[in-house]
């Protein structure tokens, strides 16, 4: 168990969980009132037994009329209590689910990139869907049973004490015995619940990977492999669920057997004249009815333990994510629009404290409006360097200055407003063309501005040919568009944002040469008047850059124009020869 999970173990988790009830306390109070009414009606039903017996022993017209009315009244009251308790608790449950999911999702949007690097999408989605439902079961469904059946037991026990406190003392011995049994199974329930939640995350993760990569799966014949992977995850989930069911199936009848033995002993003692005393036949039957009626609510109270333990285990997982530290945003400087001068001074960075440095002693100056290309072999640190600009990761060594001001002095929102990013991994949403271009903070853009951005990105032609033009739904990640069309959509989004700094991280590497050539004019339009950093794989696309920075093993090894570096006949020239010799071959 993690430190966070330990910190909020047991009652502390439930206490934090119940804090979600505060905004809904009025509705919750109505649910409690309904359960109290239900419990009182159940106790009244036991007491009504003596009136029924009396009416049978001494028949009278009044008894014949009043006893049936009493029964109808008690059941009507019980029905009212059941309705109020059930309906208002359901409203509380939906309210908690909604609030917790919103809080979880909101927190997810402000977590640092490192968190997403170490957590799979499937597990994160499973927390928002499956785990929150389990938590709600503990917070509401379990409370319904605890309140309704708990008040019922209290009401019946109170009545039994009133009728014969001596007999009832024996019944109270049940408490510690049942408590020991519940304590044992609770630990097992919680342990298995954690495994079930983890396995549900595995199931979701495998399914989402297979669905998202269905083209690769079919192309490479991975259907059987993915099926077996999913089957193993699902079988583990079933195994843990069956262990939970087995524990619950064994604990419930054992507790019921203990209760039945005590009730039998109670009846045996009550039949003794010395113990029974002056109890009438009606009072005796009413007492036995109350004692036997206690069995059902006590059984339900023990069964709900499984729900509570599942909820506590799920809550530990949910609270663990909610307690994850958010992105550091200690800067306060808000810039309207920067000029775009960047300076890297002795910059160093590693993805982990123990890991090998990804960047070492980076010193570089980029003037406003310059186009700087970053080239080098895979793993040389190109993408890492550009990812530090919008502070997706925080650097600890050296400094990055933007217009002479340390990057960490900028408020994150202000800093990221100055930067547009176009990568090889195009992200489009299952929304309209307009909403994909005018995304997020750009939502206030006018239709004319969106259209102009699409035109500048050379996307207007294919957009107008879509069924509903700018109102066409694109499907998940724009599956209805070709690779080049999807890339032009992202360029249109960047044009609409109109940021002074542009990052092109292998923006055309996923396209073929023909598509890349067609999109080049849109990229040139996007780059005009902006400080542009281009992470390039194809050297032919960056020959006109103002400055080419060659990186190797996290260090800058060469800087210069294309002509200067070719004449120097160093690392860049070697890369250039290698790439163009492969192209000729």
From Swiss-Prot:
Gene behind the chain: msbA
Topology term for the membrane: Multi-pass membrane protein
Protein name: ATP-dependent lipid A-core flippase
Similarity remark: Belongs to the ABC transporter superfamily. Lipid exporter (TC 3.A.1.106) family.
Residues that bind ATP: 376-383
Record-linked SMART domains: AAA (SM00382)
Any one GO molecular function term: ATP binding
ABC transmembrane type-1 domain mapped to chain residues: 29-310
Described function: Involved in lipopolysaccharide (LPS) biosynthesis. Translocates lipid A-core from the inner to the outer leaflet of the inner membrane. Transmembrane domains (TMD) form a pore in the inner membrane and the ATP-binding domain (NBD) is responsible for energy generation.
Organism, scientific name: Hahella chejuensis (strain KCTC 2396)
UniProt note: domains: In MsbA the ATP-binding domain (NBD) and the transmembrane domain (TMD) are fused.
Domain ABC transporter, first and last residues per copy: 342-578
Cross-referenced InterPro entries: AAA+_ATPase, ABC1_TM_dom, ABC1_TM_sf, ABC_transporter-like_ATP-bd, ABC_transporter-like_CS, ABC_transpr_lipidA, P-loop_NTPase, Type_1_exporter
Catalytic activity: ATP + H2O + lipid A-core oligosaccharideSide 1 = ADP + phosphate + lipid A-core oligosaccharideSide 2
Subunit structure: Homodimer.
Classification of source organism: Bacteria, Pseudomonadati, Pseudomonadota, Gammaproteobacteria, Oceanospirillales
């Amino acid at each position: 168990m993690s430190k966070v999970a330990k910190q909020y173990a047991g009652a502390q988790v439930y206490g934090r969980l119940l804090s979600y009830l505060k905004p809904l306390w009025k509705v919750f109070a109505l649910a409690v009132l309904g359960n109290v009414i239900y419990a009182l009606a159940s106790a009244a039903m036991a007491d009504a037994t003596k009136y029924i017996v009396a009416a049978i022993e001494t028949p009278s017209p009044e008894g014949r009329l009043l006893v049936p009315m009493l029964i109808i009244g008690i059941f009507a009251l019980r029905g009212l209590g059941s309705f109020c308790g059930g309906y208002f608790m359901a409203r509380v449950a939906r309210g908690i689910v909604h609030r917790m999911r919103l809080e979880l999702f909101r927190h997810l949007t402000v977590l640092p990139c490192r968190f997403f690097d170490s957590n799979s999408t499937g597990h994160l989605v499973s927390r928002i869907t499956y785990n929150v439902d389990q938590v709600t079961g503990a917070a509401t469904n379990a409370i319904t049973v605890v309140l309704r059946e708990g008040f019922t037991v209290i009401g019946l026990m109170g009545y039994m004490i009133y009728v014969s406190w001596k007999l009832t003392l024996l019944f109270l011995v049940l408490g510690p015995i049942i408590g020991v049994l519940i304590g044992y199974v609770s630990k097992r329930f919680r342990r298995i619940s954690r495994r079930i939640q983890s396995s549900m995350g595995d199931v979701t993760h495998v399914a989402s990977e297979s669905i998202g990569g269905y083209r690769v799966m079919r192309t490479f014949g991975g259907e059987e492999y993915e099926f077996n992977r999913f089957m193993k995850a699902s079988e583990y989930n079933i195994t843990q669920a069956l262990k939970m069911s087995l524990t619950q199936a064994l604990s419930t009848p054992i507790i019921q057997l203990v209760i039945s033995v005590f009730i039998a002993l109670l009846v045996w003692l009550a039949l003794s004249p010395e113990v029974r005393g002056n109890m009438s036949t009606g009072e005796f039957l009413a007492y036995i009815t109350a004692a036997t009626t206690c069995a059902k609510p006590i059984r339900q109270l023990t069964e709900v333990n499984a729900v509570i333990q599942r909820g506590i285990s799920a809550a530990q997982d949910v609270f663990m994510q909610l307690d994850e530290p958010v992105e550091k945003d200690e800067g306060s400087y808000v810039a309207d629009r920067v000029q775009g001068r960047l300076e890297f001074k002795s910059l160093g960075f590693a993805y982990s404290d123990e890991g090998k440095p990804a960047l070492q002693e980076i010193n570089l100056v980029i003037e406003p409006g310059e186009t700087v290309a970053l080239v080098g072999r895979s793993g040389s640190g190109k993408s890492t360097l550009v990812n530090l600009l919008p502070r997706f990761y925080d650097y600890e060594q050296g400094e990055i200055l933007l217009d002479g001001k340390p990057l960490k002095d900028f408020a994150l929102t202000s800093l990221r407003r100055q930067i547009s990013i176009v990568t090889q991994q195009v992200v489009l949403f299952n929304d309209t063309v307009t909403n994909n271009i005018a995304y997020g903070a750009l939502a206030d853009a006018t239709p004319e501005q969106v259209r102009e951005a699409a035109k500048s990105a050379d996307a207007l032609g294919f957009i107008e040919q879509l069924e509903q033009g700018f109102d066409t739904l694109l499907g998940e990640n724009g599956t209805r568009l070709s690779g080049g069309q999807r890339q032009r959509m992202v360029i249109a989004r960047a044009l609409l944002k109109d940021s002074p700094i542009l990052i092109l991280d292998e923006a055309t590497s996923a396209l073929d040469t023909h598509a890349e050539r067609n999109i080049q004019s849109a990229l040139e339009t996007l780059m005009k008047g902006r400080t542009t950093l281009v992470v390039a794989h194809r050297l032919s696309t960056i020959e006109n850059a103002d400055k080419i920075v060659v990186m190797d093993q996290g260090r800058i090894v060469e800087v210069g124009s294309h002509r200067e570096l070719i004449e120097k006949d160093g690392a860049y020239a070697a890369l250039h020869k290698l790439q163009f010799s492969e192209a000729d071959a």
